C-alpha cells in the first residue's frame, strides 16, 4: 500500500495536480492512518537496480568487444559466461560484506549513543540544542524546548540524534538482511547479464556467425530495449521523469557497448588476421 501511495503521489506531482495530490493523501490516510512507509524496501530496490544495470552493461560491453574482435561464437560464449558468474559472485559478496560492515558500524554507534544519553544526558541535550540553533536557525529558547520535549521519548531522541549528528538512519537490519541483499545482487546481475549473452547465442543459432556486425546489432538492440524498460522502472522510485531516466540508461548502455565494439574492430584490423 505504501509503495503504491508514493507512485500515485509522484504522478500527481509530475502533473502539477494539487487536487489529485490532496485526494491521494486523504485516500491513503483513511486506509492506513497516514503510515506513508516511504522506505519502499529502498535498500532492496537499490540493490536490485544496481545489480541489474551493472550486470547487463558489464556483459554487454564484454560481448561487444568480443564480437568486434570477430572471435568465434564459442569463445564469445565461454568468455561471456565466465565473466558473468565471476562478476556476479564478486558483486554479491561485495554487497554482503559492505552491508555487514554498515550494520556493524551502525550498531556500534547506537550503543555508544545510548551509553552517552544514559550517562551524559546534559551534554547530549546540548549537542542537539547546538544543532537546532546552528543548522536550523532556531532561537535558543525554542531549541531548548524542542530538546526537552523530544528527550521524553528516549528512542525518538536516539534516532533523531543519530540522524542529525552522524547522518545514520537506524534500521532493524541484521546479518541475515545483508545475506539477502548479497543474494539479490548476485541474482539480478546474473539475470540481466544473461540478456546480451542470450541474444547473441540466439542470433548465432539461426544466422551466420561470420556477419559479426549483424550479431552486434541484435545484441545492441536487445540490450537497449531492456535498459529502456529498466529506466522506466527505476524512475518510479526517483525524482526523474520516466522518459528522462529511461533515455539516460539507453545513452549509458550505448556508450558502454559501442566503445568495446569499436576497440575490438580496431584491434582485429591492426592484427592483420
Swiss-Prot record:
Topological domain spans for side Vacuolar: 69-72, 203-212, 268-273
Name this protein carries in UniProt: Vacuolar iron transporter
Protein topology in the membrane: Multi-pass membrane protein
Subunit: Monomer.
Major location (coarse): membrane
Disruption phenotype: Non-essential during asexual blood stages. Parasites yield lower levels of parasitemia and liver infection. Moderate reduction in size of developing exoerythrocytic parasite forms. Increased labile iron pools in blood stages. Increased sensitivity to iron overload in liver stages. Decreased sensitivity to iron chelating conditions in liver stages. No significant defects during transmission to or development within Anopheles stephensi mosquitoes.
Domain of life: Eukaryota
Signal peptide positions (record): none
